Amino acid sequence: MSQAPMVREHCERCLNSARWNGNPVLMIVDAAFDSIGLNYFQSVVPKVELFNQQFVATGQVRVLEDLVKADDTELRQIWKNSRSWKVAREIAAHLVWVKQQKKIGDRDALIYWAKNAPLNGWEKDPVGSIKGVGINTYQYLRMMGGVDTVMPDKIVKRVIYEILDTAGIKHPANDIEFVLAVEALAPGTGFRAIEICWMTWLIQSEAGLSRTEKYAALLPKI
């Protein structure tokens, strides 16, 4: 944690569903853009900020319903990948259904979904079953909805596998077992699973600097 001093603060925002100023529309767009595997800080974050400026700040997309109905041609002026927008709109559509069923707001709908979204059988969940939503996007959304968990992506796995190898512990057999293993190991490390997840990303180097150093001014905003 000493290598990533902003991790705990960032994870608190995540667990409080307060990333992107607590705006679920931006959190969903973030996850949808991130789902295609581009560099998060260099590609995804600037485009989410641009979407915020041109659609959210102008009042064009204020709530989840607006995102569901947003014009694809206009959206693709921000981000050209149509699949990302389809993923974003379908996630938003399910959360709109949650809103209506539970008579709650956008943020509470994300939180309610995340708290009730299963890890085992995630592919059968209404969000998990959306084409383009893999286990990493699913887990990322759960994290932004307040769940203390981890994404089984390649960077997190590489770091955790190095730790397991040093301890002589066998690698988990699949993504679900990996997530469960990290959740089980986390208390013994003094960190939460979500902190371990973000720490593995933020200690990575770009241009000779850790991401916490390189993006120090950006992290508090997201």
Where are these regions (language model features)?
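Structure-specific DNA junction-binding interface
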Residues: 1-84
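Short, hydrophobic/amphipathic alpha-helical patches that form generic packing surfaces
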Residues: 26-39, 89-94, 143, 194-207
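Catalytic DNA-binding helix-loop module of base-excision-repair DNA glycosylases/AP lyases
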Residues: 32-33, 115-167
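A basic, often C-terminal nucleic-acid-binding module that engages the phosphate backbone, implemented
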Residues: 32-33, 172-222
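Short helix-capping/linker segments at secondary-structure and domain boundaries
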Residues: 35-46, 96-104, 204-211
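Alpha-helix N-cap and coil->helix boundary residues
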Residues: 43-46, 151, 155, 173
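Alpha-helical ds-nucleic-acid-binding substructure associated with the helix-hairpin-helix region
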Residues: 54-130
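Short, positively charged loop/turn segments that connect secondary-structure elements
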Residues: 61, 165-173
